[in-house]
Amino acid sequence: MNEKIRNIAIIAHVDHGKTTLVDQLLRQSGVFRANEQVQDRVMDSGDIERERGITILSKNTSVNYNGFRINIVDTPGHADFGGEVERILKMVDGVLLLVDAFEGCMPQTRFVLRKALELGKTPVVVINKVDRPGARPYEVVDEVLNLFIELGANDDQLDFPIVYASARDGVSGYEPDELTHSMQPIFDTIIQHVPAPMGDENEPLQVLISTIDYDDYVGRIGIGKIERGVAVRNRSVVVCCADHEEHREARLSRLYRFEGLKRVEAETVGVGDIVALAGIPGISIGETVCAPTAVEPLPFVHIDEPTVSMDFIVNTSPFAGREGKYVTSRNIRDRLFKEVETNVAMRVETTASTDAFKVSGRGELHLSILIETMRRQGYEFAVSRPKVIMKRDEQGHLLEPIEELTVDVPQEYMGTVMENLGTRRAVLTNMINENQGSVRLVFDVPARGLMGFRSELLTETRGNGIMSHIFKDYEPYTGEIAERTRGSLIASETGEANSYGLFNTQERGRLFCRPGDPIYEGQIVGECSRNEDITVNVCKKKHVTNMRASGSDEALRLTPPLEFSLEQCLEFIRDDELVEVTPKSIRMRKRFLTKDQRIKEFNRIQAQGKEYDE
């Protein structure tokens, strides 16, 4: 047992300030030099993480405080990245539960806390943002206590210490109105209450790999906590897994420990510390690295199954290969299977077609982040509409995933939101009137019903609605849900959109393109005002004659086009439509590009339906 080490994960709902808190802990423990320029949210290292202000991958860091070494793991707050959180909990002995002093306990708080309590982790509660207008720290503490009781915490876990803080300003204290300009109360509480890691350094080595990193110089790096023994550089080890009998030998060519934000090479790393191991080819998450004298694999945490799937397809549009660097099915296949090695909550399967791969994940956000990442890496492909993964019980009844949805809205929009969710088969389970005229609504809603809801909520509440959801359980199928009530405007020829063609088309619906945009036959160029697909020609040019007429040369006034994000495109498309993704563009298109192909496919489906009825 190493008394001078503490391993802790920071868990919280999205946007409650985890990454900002880690920033302050690093600053105040002397990790950065006095003259060092440091960006905000230093733990969010990916471009997409910094742009969206969310954490996607959990990160490791370490601080030294009064002779103690505190290893900190910053975890994602979105339920879609819950697979990251679940396995990270295997590396730590305690959790720092961060709760917003205004918002209180949210669905993601419940999800991660349940996992932590089941694994017997010691909690420390930090009530953050106590300086926020409308903060209610004491009420939030009562909410946290009720949540602990509801989740079946034991007596030791219920006796949790509380620290109040404002991570943005770097202040903390044991009472909300007695804050000091330092993070010392948080450091002291961690050292006093979080147990030191168990294990005997005189026993043979045993490390469970919880995270994988990659380095161009040394290759794959396995990161995990040393459960017992000591890791020594250049020593032989055996890699094994609890799921199968196979063992393989390897040598630890390099060892790293975490100091601040850097990985530092070490000759030996002791029990209880978090270590990064290099030199083991093909190491993957869930494997155990042991000494050759005692090959004993450790069980890995159960990761919840994916709930949403979509097809990744080779791009077959007329513009294929113009903008992307990696466009073949082999490129896409290799990239997807590489993703699965580190993204434990994701699944990739081959399909009957060599050009399509079925990718399953925790939610729309989980999959759209992968699409955005691949796009930035130079990949070009098409994706289908996300579909919910159904199951059948022992009696053969159809089951579907149900999500617990929490919506915070101003009172005047409450009726509109409830009406919208009613059409999506949602059931209201709780309603809480909050201060400052807002209401918190809690629903049980099928995962199918959430597709496309986020953008509708923002429209209905004029940007004031906040939603978050979390997987609850599989329950009996709730019935059909009404889909998009409007059709698509489909380009009839390939060319360049121009003002004349767009002006004549805009009265039929809302447009997605502007003059000068390259267009191909079968591309979706707008949303029809009626519930049918209409073929339009936005490339049509005005015939030039040598006759002049008054009023014929007036300037054409065009309505500005709608610009969709990747998530909005995935929400908009129907089953017979695809989203084409390239490094420079995101376009929507029909699966069958020509009108003749679409009519043939429609007739084929109709004929199959008649045979089925007979």
At which residue positions do the language-model features occur?
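Conserved nucleotide-binding/hydrolysis modules and their immediate coupling elements
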Residues: Q206-M310, F319-R322, R486, T494-T545, ...
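Long insertion/accessory domains within large nucleic-acid-processing enzymes
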Residues: F258, R263-A266, L399, V445, ...
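A glycine-rich phosphate-binding loop feature that marks nucleotide/adenosyl-phosphate handling sites
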Residues: P161-R168, P204-D213, T350-G361, K387-D393, ...
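Active-site phosphate-binding and catalytic loops of NTP-dependent enzymes
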Residues: V31-S58, F81, L147-D159, I191-L205, ...
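Charged, conformationally dynamic linker/hinge segments
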Residues: V295, I303-G437, R448
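P-loop NTPase switch module centered on the Walker A-proximal segment
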Residues: M1-V99, E103, E143, I212-D215
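Conserved nucleotide-binding/hydrolysis micro-motifs of P-loop NTPases
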Residues: H16, Q28, H78-A79, F102-C105, ...
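Canonical P-loop GTPase G-domain recognition
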Residues: T122, R132-Q192
